[in-house]
From Swiss-Prot:
The lineage of its organism: Bacteria, Bacillati, Bacillota, Bacilli, Lactobacillales. Its EC number is 3.6.5.3. This is Elongation factor Tu. PROSITE patterns: G_TR_1 (PS00301), G_TR_2 (PS51722). Residues 82-85 are annotated as: G3. Residues 11-205 form the tr-type G domain. NCBIfam families: EF-Tu, PRK00049.1, PRK12735.1, PRK12736.1, small_GTP. It is found in: Cytoplasm. The keyword Nuclease does not apply. Residues 175-177 are annotated as: G5. HAMAP family: EF_Tu_B.
Length: 396
């Protein structure tokens, strides 16, 4: 049996993706980037059909087609997300299946910004993609350079409209198809694009550098030692002796100190993002901590009942609802590890939400949850997933 390739972490890692209107060349650009970098020995060339036949993934009960390619520049290691269909993009961005540190917005110079261009920019803004680099594609098909200048101005205005620094965002012009076909000048523009991405999109703060957060999945007692809360560490690190807070489902925040940590039945000095651990808590009774709460670094997260959310509602074919819903709809919101009933209030001018819609609304929970801007959730009804979303604004 062949040994698995070991991932060697020598360069900083950044997650990016291509966004933009259908047929503007997102997948062609993805293929062109890998092809051009492959010539420098920094990537494996992926052809269009490989990327376009994206495998299905399940993220929190929702099926999404996503292609992931990886490549390197001289400075960084990139994981690049590309989704074949428009609905896949929306689901990807809202469920956080592909958490992007930055995005390459692809706009065809032949068309200019189109409806999905706008929708993707809005979504990127809502889900916290703070850095966008623009690639004006198909420039070889436009004879008059002044027309390309006009398209660039339109794109900059559109970005400004959604609170991006439209005047300062870097714009690179080129032709992804020509680069794929081996045109030297077009390939130079692809390298210029990647240099721009290297420079403009900052290296993200690593998950381990963020404040500790662990959703509690299970609670048990070790006789003579105390109460253990177990779960997967979402972010940050925790070590024996750390002070933590138990937050969520009740208004009162409990404080405790970590007196022991174990993973796979072995004791541990410290745990970090991604680890499944049991955390022994000093002075906490078995019934004072429950599934659905979180353990967190003191002061790092609070409970809230009311928030605004950006949501994708599943279609009937995806196992979602068969009928629309209206304001006052009361499903369960599954946060971290538990369901909390909440009432939905649709924005003014929205009568109802149809299966398949991507929408924004306000939620009021019947119990407080440990949430913040960017917290992901699914919407469930009788145990089945009918939607997925994330918190875009806290309202209380």
């Amino acid at each position: 049996m062949a040994e698995k390739e070991h991932y060697v972490r020598t360069k900083p890692h950044v997650n990016i993706g291509t966004i933009g209107h259908v047929d503007h060349g997102k997948t062609t650009l993805t293929a062109a980037i890998t092809t051009v970098l492959a010539e420098k020995g920094l990537a494996k060339a992926e052809d269009y059909s490989q990327i376009d036949a994206a495998p299905e993934e399940k993220e929190r009960g929702i099926t999404i087609n996503t292609a992931h390619v990886e490549y390197e520049t001289e400075k960084r290691h990139y994981a690049h997300m590309d989704a074949p269909g428009h609905a896949d993009y929306i689901k990807n961005m809202i469920t956080g299946a592909a958490q992007m540190d930055g995005a390459i917005l692809v706009v065809a110079a032949t068309d200019g910004p189109m409806p999905q261009t706008r929708e993707h920019i809005l979504l990127a803004r809502q889900v916290g993609v703070n850095y966008i680099v623009v690639f004006l594609n198909k420039c070889d098909l436009v004879d008059d350079p002044e027309l390309i200048d006009l398209v660039e101005m339109e794109v900059r205005d559109l970005l400004t409209e959604y609170d991006y620094p439209g005047d300062d965002i870097p714009v690179v012009r080129g032709s992804a198809l020509k680069a794929l076909e081996g045109d030297k000048e077009a390939q130079e523009q692809i390298l210029k694009l990647m240099d721009t991405v290297d420079e403009y999109i900052p290296t993200p703060e690593r998950q381990t550098d963020k404040p500790f957060l662990m959703p509690v999945e299970d609670v048990f007692t070790i006789t003579g030692r105390g109460t253990v809360a177990s779960g997967r560490i979402d972010r940050g690190t925790v070590k024996v002796g750390d002070e933590v807070e138990i937050v969520g489902l009740v208004d009162k925040v409990l404080k405790s100190v970590v007196t022991g940590l174990e993973m796979f039945h072995k004791t541990l000095d410290s745990g970090e993002a991604g680890d499944n651990v049991g955390v022994l808590l000093r002075g906490i009774d078995r019934d004072q901590v429950v599934r659905g709460q979180v353990l967190a670094a003191p002061g790092s997260i609070q409970t809230h009942n009311k928030f605004k959310a950006q949501v994708y509602v599943l279609k009937k074919e995806e196992g979602g609802r068969h009928t629309p819903f209206f304001s006052d709809y009361r499903p369960q919101f599954y946060f971290h590890t538990t369901d909390i009933t909440g009432e939905i209030e649709l924005p003014e001018g929205t009568e109802m939400v149809m299966p398949g819609d991507n929408t924004e609304f306000t939620v009021t929970l019947i119990k407080p949850a440990a949430i913040e801007k960017g917290t992901k959730f699914t919407i469930r009804e009788g145990g089945r997933t009918v939607g997925a979303g994330q918190v875009t604004e806290i309202l209380d």
